[in-house]
Amino acid sequence: MSPISAEINPDAVLQFVDVTVRRGSATLLDRINWTVEEDERWAVLGPNGAGKTTLLQIAAAQLHPSAGEVYVLGERLGRVDVFELRPRIGLASSALSERIPGAEVVRDVVVSAGYSVLGRWREAYGRLDVRRAVGLLDRFGVGQFSERTFGTLSQGEKARVQIARALMTDPELLLLDEPAAGMDLGGREDLLRRLTRFADDPGAPASVLVTHHVEELPPGITHALLLRNGAVVAAGLARDVLADEPLSATFGLRLRVERSSGRWFARAVLD
């Protein structure tokens, strides 16, 4: 099935059907049709103001569209209890990170995801929950910070903790909002290596990764969606979409795109 088809797909992990979002006189998303299926790894790219954050908020069941239909894990937004749906969705974003108390212990930041709260819950956490949380922190290279407070971490370290938290509930859909933002080169490459290894796990969920930069995409991305001014420029297989013409149209600049060892790289074409 085409990822831009408006036909309802009952087996889709995520589907937008003619989705529009308006705020006052501004149109943030304009008639978006998009489908994510099982085992797909999507990248969403576009310049600032393209609508990427709005799209991710809807996918995370945190925002309802002004028009159109959204289906998340087989449930239609507006006809489902989002508080029951959200634990099935893993979300890592800088906006969520800003809401976490700085005094919160890193281990508890991750464990509390299983209780749908941001701070330490009133009950004592189970041993198995704590063990799983520490294991996820280890998996993303921040296990040594499990007893530290969240506010003492760097931006990149917080992003890794956010990913561990997003996976705590064993979600069916994983949403990552610019996970490599603010990282130095070494930190970015290490994170992408870990994300690639995670995506290779047979039990890994379908995922959507939002970024401004093709260089921040890990190998294993299968599909891409390009947004500009709230509208879809292109959507489909990554090898077709992450190419010179679609990316140039998306960013309003002539770009040359190359791929090496499963990674994408883009540079401006100088006249």
Show where each model-derived region lies.
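H-loop (His-switch) and adjacent beta-strand-loop-beta switch element
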Residues: 224-237
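Conserved ABC transporter NBD signature motif
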Residues: 68-78
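Catalytic Walker B motif of ABC-type/P-loop ATPase nucleotide-binding domains
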Residues: 174-178
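Helix-to-loop junction immediately C-terminal to a conserved catalytic motif
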Residues: 60
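ABC-family P-loop ATPase nucleotide-binding domains
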Residues: 98-152
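Conserved catalytic motifs of ABC-family nucleotide-binding domains
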Residues: 170
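ABC ATPase nucleotide-binding domains
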Residues: 249-271
